[in-house]
Amino acid sequence: DPSKKVERRVRFQATKYVILENELYYRTIDGILLRCLGDDEARSLMGEIHEGVCGAHQSAFKMKWMIRRNGYFWPTILEDCFKYFKGCQGCQKFGNIQRAPASAMNPIIKPWPFRGWAIDLIGQIYPPSSKGHKFILVATDYFTKWVEAIPLKKVTSANMIDFVKEHIIYRFGIPQTITTDQGTMFTSGEFEEFAIGMGIKVLNSSPYYAQANGQAEASNKGIIKLIKRKIEENPKRWHTLLNEALWSYRMACHGSTKVSPYQLVYGHDAVLPWEVKAGSRRLSFQDQLTSDGYA
């Protein structure tokens, strides 16, 4: 009640909140409204974001970014995210062990999306999947960090060509460059002829320093960690969860771009399970639109 004597600090904090349709919202410094969540909703949201169907087991800071990015708020977000992250058994079991001080990476940057891709092979994987897959072929776009990947039973030049055509060219256009290691499937005459015919320049990293293809190496680590966390109880079904792992990777905040690959590719945020469950301002607005409003 404004007529009552209230401490100045409380009055100031109250100006940051607004009630719309019986829902409490927090107004950011940019004027964006974030729906305020109670304790139960906050715990449920953290669980979905961290380890749900499209959760990528991200750090506390990235969890906070995802929560606010998707339109939610409560006063102790970061503190609660740290508690949840530190209590996650999957993160404790499969998280990185830092043996040396972290140093800044210098990623290759292309001036346009999908003009340069890094391709690498994960495997041989043990145990193989229940369908006999032993490898994962991974491609990462240098600009957006978008990742494409498929499981493979065997590695051939024909498989590489089909992958480039179906998962890169047919979806994103012909790239300028593809960076690979010195694997025979990439250096074969068949693959070289295909690349020349498409006008693609194939760059090979040194066999003595495969880490030169750093973008592919980084993507591989991320995909492997996601798969391990999702298939702990049944390792032989990893091929069925690869697309789920890719979804998690594409929706996660990337360290170098500070946004998700999905947002860079499509220009907006995807509607994810937690937003459907908790509800959001944008979904409410979309539900009220008529066919004329969409025009």
How would you label these PLM feature ranges?
Residues 1-131, 138-144, 150, 249, ...:
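RNase H-like DDE catalytic core and adjacent DNA/metal-binding regions
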Residues 151, 177-181:
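Short catalytic-loop micro-motif centered on adjacent basic/acidic residues
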